[in-house]
Every structure is written in structure tokens, then in C-alpha cells.
Design a protein with these regions (language model features):
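Glycosyltransferase donor-sugar binding loop
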Residues: 40-46, 190, 217-232, 250-251
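Nucleotide-activated donor-binding/catalytic signature segment of Leloir-type glycosyltransferases, i.e.
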Residues: 231-252
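Short alpha-helical donor nucleotide-sugar binding micro-motif in glycosyltransferases
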Residues: 251-252, 259-264
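A short, well-ordered alpha-helix in the C-terminal region of glycosyltransferases
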Residues: 328, 335, 342-356
Length: 377
């Protein structure tokens, strides 16, 4: 029996971010590739993380080149289904709108896998509203969490939505992990140094903790971006008197990155907006309690009061206007810094949830099931 042909149009590294990592997992999946006749086009135009979401003439030429590459692949492969990981808002959405509409004109059956959110923030703009109506018409949608349906419900029926959370491969040195008990607890920030990740609010929270006499070591792992330069970051640390308890290590990958997880006691991610960050899953795998903003689909991973603490209230926040409160961050961190038993309990709860729901094996089986259903629609 002939396998169904699927053309995967998705982001793969470089640059390295959540969506590109998941794209690479799909590309390398033995189960997915053995279940279908798979063909791939890398949707990424930016090769540097700081260029993601930016415009410019050079980027525009890259978009046109990518559009022609997609068109050529469709004509050559003649797929039964096209899987694409487009953007939901802003300049990247306008670029992907053209690609999706071209696929529809070419008569393709399309399933879109959203690794981001933002539709609700733009749906009241007349142009975006018009584009969204055409963008979502006649397609199926894969979301990272049930909570994210709120972002697209104006345009997509619930029966046309599938949920497939992010996942990560098992890390050998996280197996049989023991929860850390550093004499001075280490708080791990492992994402890029960006204002939209809540870096300033987090630094303010650390200042509050230090002023209260709390003992901690804050480790920062991640790349610098145009949102915050190295000089600006250093200046903020100096201004708040945090140089003695904060260390910046730059971006780390592979075993170098995992060593920071294995040495940490608490993981923090006070972002303004997220969909379903892979870094939270990595923290859960290493049995770290998580303090994170309750934005997007974060609550699908972190259970408030069970495997960590959610910032901003009990209900998932979809709008990008959210800003974390430094005092709330400080309060949640102080609870974990002073209660070793609670850190252990929450960390192990997160680890157990990771093993049940977020391993790569679970993801692959779920993705094969979703793709099989969509090939038939």
C-alpha cells in the first residue's frame, strides 16, 4: 500500500528556538517518517535569532525565494497533505499569509501547526480581520494547548482544532534525577535576554529578595538581542546592586545547557507572552519547580501550586498587554528559596507530569494520529 505523501513546510534550525527545535524533531522522527512519505521545506528565512520577526529588503527577497521553493516542492511532490508552521500575527503573519493562500490556490489540503499566539491581539484591525477570515478558511489547526483555542475561536470551529503539546527528547543525565539542595539556592533563567521575557521585572524581584536578606544565586543563560544589549544588562545589574548574586553565562547548548539545569534549584520564566515554551519542559524533566507567567499554554505544563507557581492569576492570559509584577515574582521565589521540601515536592511532580505527557515518544504518536486524521479530511 502506498504511503500518503505529506509536505512539511516548517522552521528548522538555525536559529534555535522552540518552533525550530520541534521542526527538527519531526524531521528526524523515525515513527513519522516511516508512517508517511515525508518531504521537507525549511520555512525559516532568518538565520540569526535577533532577525526573527524583522523586515527589510534582504528579508523580502528571502521570502520570495522561499515562496518559489514551496511552489516548486508542491508541484514536484503532489502531496496528499501540506503541514505548515505559520505565524499568527505581525510581519511574519503577512509573509505566511501569502504562502498559505498560494497553497490553497494550488488546491492543497492544509493543516497549520501554531507555535505562537497573537490572533486575538490583531483581530479588531480591519485588514488583519479580513486576512484571518481567508487564512483560516478550510484548514485544520494544531495548537499547543487547549487554552490557546481562545486566541483563534473567532475564526476556527473547535472541531477543526487538534491539540499537540510540545515535547523534548529524554536527556540521559536527567534520568533518575535527584532534586538539588544547594546551600545557596540557584535560580535559573534560561531564555534570551529580552524585555518581553520579563527580564526587568525579574531583576526588580531579585532586588526585592536581596533587600530582604534572601540568599540566592541567579544564573542567566541565553543570547543577547536587540531588545537588550550586554551593556544595558550589565548596567541594570549594577544599578540594582545585583552583581554579587547574578552571573551571565551567554547562550549554551546541548550538554553545556543541561549542566545548568542539573545544578539549578528553581526555574523562572516571567514572560509577557508565550505559547508553550520548550524550556519549561526541560526544567520539568530536571525536576525543577517552575515560576512562570500564566500566559498562552503555560498552564498545560505548570500546575499552579503543584509543580510550581503561575504569575498573573488563575486564568490563562492571551493578550500581549500582560506585564508580570515584580513583587509577585519575589513572593513566589521566596517561598521556594526558603522551603527545601516544597522545592523537592514540586520538582518531582513536574518530572512525573513530563514523563506522562511531554516525552518525544508521546509527541510522535500524537502527531502521527493527527496527521492520519487530516490526510483523510
Amino acid at each position: 500500500m502506498m504511503k500518503q505523501k505529506i509536505l512539511f513546510i516548517m522552521h528548522m534550525p538555525p536559529p534555535v528556538h522552540g518552533a525550530s527545535m520541534v521542526g527538527q524533531f519531526i524531521h528526524d522522527s523515525q515513527l513519522i517518517n516511516s508512517s508517511f512519505d515525508c518531504h521537507y521545506v525549511n520555512l525559516a528565512v532568518a538565520t540569526q535569532l535577533e532577525d526573527v520577526g524583522k523586515g527589510g529588503w534582504h528579508k523580502a527577497k528571502g521570502v520570495m525565494k522561499k515562496l518559489m521553493e514551496v511552489r516548486k516542492a508542491v508541484k514536484s511532490v503532489k502531496p496528499d497533505l501540506v503541514y505548515i508552521t505559520p505565524n499568527s500575527a505581525g510581519i511574519p503573519f503577512y509573509k505566511d499569509f501569502i504562502t498559505v493562500m498560494m497553497l490553497k490556490v494550488m488546491g492543497q489540503k492544509v493543516v497549520m501547526h501554531f507555535h505562537n499566539k497573537g490572533v486575538e491581539t490583531r483581530q479588531d484591525k480591519w485588514l488583519d480581520n479580513w486576512m484571518y477570515k481567508h487564512y483560516f478558511k478550510g484548514v485544520k489547526l494544531i495548537l499547543l494547548a487547549d487554552a490557546l483555542y481562545e486566541d483563534v475561536k473567532k475564526y476556527v470551529k473547535r472541531e477543526d482544532v487538534f491539540v499537540c503539546p510540545n515535547a523534548i527528547p529524554a536527556i540521559s543525565n536527567a534520568n533518575g534525577v535527584t532534586v538539588n539542595s544547594n546551600h545557596v539556592p540557584h535560580i535559573l533563567w534560561l531564555t534570551n535576554i529580552m524585555k518581553t521575557k520579563g527580564i526587568m521585572e525579574y531583576l526588580s524581584a531579585l532586588k526585592i529578595l536581596k533587600d530582604k536578606g534572601a540568599k540566592f544565586q541567579a544564573d542567566f543563560v541565553g543570547g543577547l538581542t536587540k531588545e537588550m544589549s550586554g551593556d544595558e544588562f550589565d548596567s541594570a545589574l549594577s544599578m540594582m546592586g545585583l552583581n554579587g548574586c547574578c552571573t551571565y553565562y551567554g547562550p549554551k547548548y546541548g550538554d553545556d545547557k543541561y549542566s545548568f539545569f542539573s545544578q539549578a534549584d528553581v526555574f523562572v520564566l516571567p514572560s509577557y507572552t508565550e505559547a508553550f515554551p520548550v524550556s519549561i519542559l526541560e526544567a520539568m524533566q530536571f525536576a525543577l519547580p517552575v515560576v512562570a507567567s500564566n500566559v498562552g499554554g503555560v498552564s498545560a505544563g505548570v500546575e499552579d501550586g503543584v509543580s510550581g507557581f503561575l504569575l498573573g492569576g488563575k486564568l490563562p492570559i492571551m493578550l500581549n498587554t500582560f506585564r508580570p509584577d515584580a513583587c509577585e515574582i519575589a513572593d513566589k521565589l521566596q517561598v521556594l528559596l526558603t522551603d527545601t521540601d516544597l522545592r523537592h515536592k514540586m520538582g518531582l511532580a513536574g518530572r512525573e507530569k513530563f514523563e506522562r505527557e511531554f516525552t518525544l515518544e508521546v509527541f510522535e504518536k500524537r502527531m502521527v494520529e493527527i496527521l492520519s486524521n487530516n490526510v483523510k479530511y
